[in-house]
């Protein structure tokens, strides 16, 4: 499948990385940073290509806010990996942020395509 054209301003995504991460962590259950990077890229058909320098600070922020919890687990190879799970507070925050996002996109669509909404 061919990717979506990704000529967009990062400003459009600013402030919404958290909701993308919360949504995926909620759906996937136990997951880790690199898996989230790949899943976002796959689901967006390559539109969003996050770097580790974006994802890991965002995950730490979510963890510090109590919206997710993280735990180091040792792999059979002996290496460690930090897995993340969403908390109840994270689920509640996700529900609110999705509602806000849906209202926002509806309002934008009223401007872009007033006869189609």
How does the language model describe each region?
Residues 11-54:
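N-terminal helix-turn-helix DNA-binding core of bacterial DNA-binding proteins
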Residues 63-80, 85:
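Beta-hairpin "wing" of winged helix-turn-helix
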Residues 55-62:
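Basic amphipathic alpha-helical segments that dock to polyanions
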